[in-house]
């Protein structure tokens, strides 16, 4: 059975790994999202054609890089906790607290960035999908070309919704990491000064 001191850093590592997986899936979905329109000339739309989707992709890339940088710190924290040390900045008193606060602030900025990426993806997709659904009047529904275009557009926007949803789930994971980090910081400050 894992000791109680290892549970908190282990939970943080698991949440960071989950966040990385969600961001990688979001990145894959938004990068693969495309819409082909059979017109004269044929047109193809991808995330590059929509600034909000470019932002979602950029946030996913930055998020993956940040999470990959944080994974070794989470692993070191588990090892140090298993050895009855304090993890990041072990034994440094106020230096350890300063490092924990720095990591915590970086996590907050990262969580906010993820939330804005998800919001941009959701907001643009909702507005454009609602507008385009209103453009398909009842007279044009039923023709095979229009039905195919409508299905293709729905698929394009559904993939964008999925990418934004995965990014929102990654932001929720980071919010949990922040809560666990604040608890750990409060526990460490209490043990240092009381």
From Swiss-Prot:
It is a multi-pass membrane protein. Residues 1-10, 77-94, 183-194 are cytoplasmic. Pfam families: CASP_dom (PF04535). Keywords: Cell membrane, Membrane, Transmembrane, Transmembrane helix. Residues 32-55, 116-161 are extracellular. The keyword Amino-acid biosynthesis does not apply. It is found in: Cell membrane. It comes from the Eukaryota. The chain crosses the membrane at residues 11-31, 56-76, 95-115, 162-182. Its main location: membrane. One of its GO terms (cellular component) is plasma membrane. Belongs to the Casparian strip membrane proteins (CASP) family. Homodimer and heterodimers. This is CASP-like protein 4D1. It comes from Sorghum bicolor (Sorghum). The lineage of its organism: Eukaryota, Viridiplantae, Streptophyta, Embryophyta, Tracheophyta.
């Amino acid at each position: 059975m894992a000791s109680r001191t290892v549970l908190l850093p282990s939970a943080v590592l698991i949440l960071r790994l989950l966040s990385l997986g969600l961001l990688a899936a979001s990145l894959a979905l938004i990068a693969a999202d495309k819409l082909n329109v059979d017109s004269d000339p044929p047109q193809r739309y991808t995330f590059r054609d929509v600034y909000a989707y470019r932002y979602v992709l950029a946030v996913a890339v930055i998020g993956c890089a940040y999470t990959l940088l944080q994974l070794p710190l989470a692993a070191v924290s588990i090892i140090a906790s298993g050895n009855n040390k304090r993890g990041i900045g072990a034994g440094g008193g106020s230096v350890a607290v300063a490092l924990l606060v720095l990591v915590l602030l970086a996590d907050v900025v990262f969580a906010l960035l993820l939330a804005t990426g998800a919001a941009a993806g959701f907001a643009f997709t909702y507005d454009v999908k609602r507008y385009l659904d209103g453009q398909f009047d009842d007279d044009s529904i039923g023709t095979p070309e229009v039905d195919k275009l409508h299905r293709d557009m729905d698929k394009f926007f559904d993939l964008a919704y999925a990418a934004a949803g995965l990014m929102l789930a990654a932001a929720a994971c980071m919010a949990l990491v922040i809560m666990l980090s604040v608890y750990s910081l409060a526990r460490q400050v209490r043990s240092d000064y009381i």
